[in-house]
Regions:
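A residue-level marker of the well-folded mature domains of exported/periplasmic proteins
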Residues: 3-13, 20-115
């Protein structure tokens, strides 16, 4: 996984929210379509390392191959107060409402792999 994706999430969160103004660290939420593939586990380790190095927090959710669950997962990440989202969409056509919710909350989204 490219560190530039993580850097983009951190920069987007830092410039689009008051994350620094209210003295809390940036939290990046990652919505995985299905965490069973070995590739995603490797990518997660890279994400964790990059986020930790930047002083950011990491939250994740595994949709378990369910577009419906992924929508609920993203809404949960938004409710938990993430400053940026990285989404590996289970279904590009079904993820729209989650993207709309993130936009309404002012949360930048990085489409990862399939979006």
């Amino acid at each position: 996984m490219h560190k530039s994706i993580i850097a983009a999430a951190i920069v987007a969160a830092g410039f689009s929210t008051a994350a620094y103004a209210d003295a809390h660290s940036i939290t990046v939420g990652v919505s995985w379509s299905d965490f069973q593939e070995e590739r995603w586990k490797t990518d997660e380790a890279a994400m964790l390392g990059a986020l930790e190095a930047a002083g950011a927090e990491y939250l994740s959710a595994d949709a378990q191959s369910s577009a419906t669950k992924q929508l609920a997962d993203v809404e949960s990440l938004i409710t938990q107060g993430v400053d940026a989202l990285i989404i590996l969409a289970q279904d590009g056509a079904s993820i729209g409402p989650a993207l709309d919710a993130a936009e309404a909350a002012g949360i930048p989204v990085i489409g990862y792999d399939r979006l």
